[in-house]
Amino acid sequence: QFRSLIVGACLATGLLITSVAQAHISLVKSIPTADAVVTTPQQIDLVFSEQLVLRASRLELSVIKDGGAAEKVEHIDVELINDGKTLRATLHNPLGVGVYQVQWRAVGDDNHPMTGEYSFTIK
């Protein structure tokens, strides 16, 4: 019975280590936040749970036009900051009033891509 307990504890520890090692990257925080109503931001920050691989990660911003069509916002620079955990898009031109959609793709050291999107409004 003691041997079964030891074997069970070892298996549980191995499963825990495996699940931690295989945890995928996740979005922790966004600025502006989803569904926020804000004035024109100078940048958009997406904070992730671990370091990103820049060449495989991206952030795109679109304005939603009348009728629902999305038009990509040009003239933004995307970089990694905060020890590679934050994907920042710096906006070179002020954004006008409207609804904006952020689409992102994040890849961590495990090379597994995670994607997402959210919207915010500028009044």
Whereabouts are the PLM-identified features?
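Absolute protein N-terminus
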Residues: 1, 22-24, 123
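Bacterial N-terminal signal peptides that target proteins for export
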Residues: 1-9, 13
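Residues at the start of alpha-helices and the adjacent loop-to-helix junctions
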Residues: 13-15, 24
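N-terminal signal peptide c-region/cleavage motif recognized by signal peptidases
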Residues: 18-20
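N-terminal non-catalytic regions of secreted/periplasmic and cell-surface proteins
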Residues: 22-60
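Acidic, low-complexity Ser/Thr/Gly/Pro-rich repeat segments typical of extracellular/periplasmic
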Residues: 36, 50-121
